[in-house]
Every structure is written in structure tokens, then in C-alpha cells.
């Protein structure tokens, strides 16, 4: 079966719209262009600043749906070891992510030559780069090298948590029940405490939907 036949147009459309809203949110939030845009079109870009970030929830729900579809399409427990699946997910994320981080470092170094703006990160240290490479920068308290890299780390954490829950269930009904319990706990407890926002459990309510 070709990859084309596995596409879901509605999912693709939702991701495209959400991506545009997140892009507009970033455009209205960072750098001198954001200030100029908000001065020129205050109503539009104030709205993008306040509400564009909510589109991240669309990505979280879709990512959870696709993870569940791939790992447990019929609601069954995961029968194989979770570690190879988690490693495969890391590699899938890391290759384009590290390339983007490299470009971000170069772009920031060039921008620092001409602009003095707090949105431009300082020169990256080796420890900072290493933390980003292993998707630990949020947890270790390093400054992000780019505005959206927090999501890549959270996506990896969420996939790992979903995989471990489905594997730990070891039975058809127990596995989805574990996902439901953790998602409910996230919605009504962890998601209400911003101190957890660097951890997957903070977002798992949306992911588990």
C-alpha cells in the first residue's frame, strides 16, 4: 500500500491551518517585525498574539491520535518492547530538528551582528547544544535556541509516555484504561499547575483525547 493511500485529508488540513496560526502567533510575538506588524495592523496581530498559540492544542490532539493509531489501532496493549519504538521516534524527530537547530544557531549569530533584540538568543554553549540534542533543554533549564523547539521535546516525551502506558497495560482493556486515567489526571490536576509545563504529563490531557 502506498503512502499516498494512508493520507488523511482532514488531518492534513487541520495541521496546515494550525501551523499558519502558530506561525502568525510567532510573527506577532518576536523581534522588530512583530512590533512593526502590530503597529500597522493592531487588531489582527493582537488577536494572533493572544489566540494563535491555542492552535498548539490541535497539534497535540492530532499527535495523540496518530500515536494511538500507530501503536494500538484496536485498543490493544503494546506487545513489543517500547524502547525500539521510542528510539525510532527520537531519530525521526532528531534529524530534521538538529538541522533546524544548526540553522537557527547560524541565523542568530548573523542577526546579532546587526540587531540588538531580546528575541535573538545568545551564542549557544556546547552544554546548551547537547541538552537540545537530547531534547532535555526544557527540563535542564537551558534557554531555547529557537521559539518552537519546546514542542519537539514535549512531543517526544508524550510519545514515550503513551508507548510506556500501552506496554505497561499488558491487556486489551487495561492499556486504554491507563491512558484514560493519566489523561484525566493531566486535565484536572497537572494541567492546572504551570510548574509542570516542561513535562509531558502537563499536556497529556490533550494528547490522550
Language-model segments: residues:
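Membrane-interface helix-loop-helix regions
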Residues: 42-44, 93-154, 185-188
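Generic alpha-helical transmembrane segments of integral inner-membrane proteins
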Residues: 20, 98-106, 110, 160, ...
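Membrane-interfacial entry segments at the cytosolic side of transmembrane helices
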Residues: 170-178
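Short, Lys/Arg-rich, polar N-terminal cytosolic tail immediately upstream
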Residues: 1-11
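Functionally critical transmembrane alpha-helices in membrane proteins and complexes, commonly lining
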Residues: 9-73, 93-97, 134, 202, ...
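Juxtamembrane transmembrane-helix termini
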Residues: 55-89, 96-117
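Specific transmembrane alpha-helix
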Residues: 55-72, 151-167, 181-209
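Aromatic-anchored segments of alpha-helical transmembrane domains
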Residues: 20-27, 106, 180-192
Amino acid at each position: 500500500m502506498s503512502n499516498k493511500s494512508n493520507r488523511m485529508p482532514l488531518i492534513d488540513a487541520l495541521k496546515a491551518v494550525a501551523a499558519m496560526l502558530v506561525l502568525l502567533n510567532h510573527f506577532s510575538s518576536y523581534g522588530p517585525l512583530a512590533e512593526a506588524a502590530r503597529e500597522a495592523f493592531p487588531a489582527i496581530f493582537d488577536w494572533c498574539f493572544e489566540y494563535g498559540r491555542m492552535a498548539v492544542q490541535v497539534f497535540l490532539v492530532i499527535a495523540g491520535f496518530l500515536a494511538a493509531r500507530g501503536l494500538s489501532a484496536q485498543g490493544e496493549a503494546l506487545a513489543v518492547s517500547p524502547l525500539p519504538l521510542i528510539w525510532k521516534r527520537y531519530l525521526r524527530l532528531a534529524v530534521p530538528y538538529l538541522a533546524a537547530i544548526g540553522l537557527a544557531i547560524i541565523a542568530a549569530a548573523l542577526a546579532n551582528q546587526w540587531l540588538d533584540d531580546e528575541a535573538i538568543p545568545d551564542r549557544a554553549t556546547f552544554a546548551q547544544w547537547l541538552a537540545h540534542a537530547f531534547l532535555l533543554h526544557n527540563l535542564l533549564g537551558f534557554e531555547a535556541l529557537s521559539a518552537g523547539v519546546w514542542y519537539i521535546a514535549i512531543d517526544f516525551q508524550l510519545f514515550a509516555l503513551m508507548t510506556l502506558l500501552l506496554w505497561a497495560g499488558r491487556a486489551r482493556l487495561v492499556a486504554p484504561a491507563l491512558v484514560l486515567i493519566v489523561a484525566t489526571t493531566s486535565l484536572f490536576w497537572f494541567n492546572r499547575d504551570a510548574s509542570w509545563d516542561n513535562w509531558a504529563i502537563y499536556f497529556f490531557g490533550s494528547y490522550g483525547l
